[in-house]
Amino acid sequence: MLDIKITNAKTRNTGKELVEIGIENGKITAIASAVEGEAKQVIDAKGNLVTESFVNGHLHLCKVYTLEMAGQAALKEYNDNNMGGAMTSIERAADFKACYDEKWIIENVRKACDLAVKYGNTHIRAFADVDSKARLEGVKGVIRGREEYKDRLDIQVVAFPQDGVAREPGAKELIKQAMDLGADVVGGIPWIEFTEEEELDHVNSMCNYAKEYDKDISMLLDDVGDAEERTLEMLCKKVIEMGWQGRATAQHCRAMELYPENYFRKLVSLLKKAQIGVVADPQWLALGHYRPQLFGS
């Protein structure tokens, strides 16, 4: 007997044809015009689309429901499409992390995860800040959420040095401690550093930790209106050098809008060679902050 049978369903592959979907042990076992066998539960899709669940590749899960604590001024600064605005926003938002506590963070994580499940989001890459203010409280709270929701959500916890590693004393050691606690991914945000040398050290250090722990990499790169930022290129080269192709993801990359075409083409070639995926965070496109012109196809 099937656990679930969905009737009168449309799928992306069947067009207007209505089909039935059989599910056993949490897996789809049959899709046909008529699936044989009885089911413990029958759901009538009423001609609606049944499709894959959603993936959220970039969610700061330790910060959900904290806007009032961080302040509207921090959000306003981030919306300024320039280097100073983005950096100032992060600095302002950092102050409230001194009150980070796993006990209230897990409550917020639960609320966000319940909404994710409700709206069909079953995979989340969840960033948790690791620095002298946040300490490991965010990581602990998000790891706890990962375990509580593991039957409904696939949550990957990113140990994320939001305030930098060169400019934030002790951050490198805290990242290692976060990985020892059970974080799944090594994060990074090299553009937050003050010099190009420090940016490169940030990229190299986090990538070396990824190799040490055999983990994937997920970094926020060039998230500023500054055409001179090159941390995405740094990551591409490091990934190729260390043989980590296909195991790194780049987030935001807003500066790509401003690159001249010849450099843009070079960067795209490097991305392909490094097999780096890009999460563009389309909410910023929806808000009309920038409109990148892509070259080629």
Model-derived regions: residue spans:
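N-terminal metal-binding scaffold of metallo-dependent hydrolase/deaminase domains
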Residues: M1-G37
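Divalent metal-coordination and catalytic microenvironments
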Residues: A9, G26, G47, H58, ...
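Active-site gating loops and adjacent loop-to-helix segments of metal-dependent hydrolytic enzymes
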Residues: Y65-I105, T231-T249, Q275-V278
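Divalent metal-dependent hydrolysis catalytic cores, especially in the metallo-beta-lactamase
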Residues: T88-C99, E107-E137, V142-I143, K150-D163, ...
